[in-house]
Swiss-Prot record:
Protein name, per record: Dermonecrotic toxin LlSicTox-alphaIII-1
UniProt keywords, alphabetically: Cytolysis, Dermonecrotic toxin, Disulfide bond, Hemolysis, Lipid degradation, Lipid metabolism, Lyase, Magnesium, Metal-binding, Secreted, Toxin
Domain of life: Eukaryota
Post-translational modification summary for this protein: Contains 1 disulfide bond.
Amino acid sequence: ADNRRPIWNLGHMVNALKQIPTFLXDGANA
């Protein structure tokens, strides 16, 4: 389980980083 958590965390962070520019763009458009 300990070996899987870091990998999942990295994947989650990558997904979050991909979503951040979208939120910034939506905020700028609003």
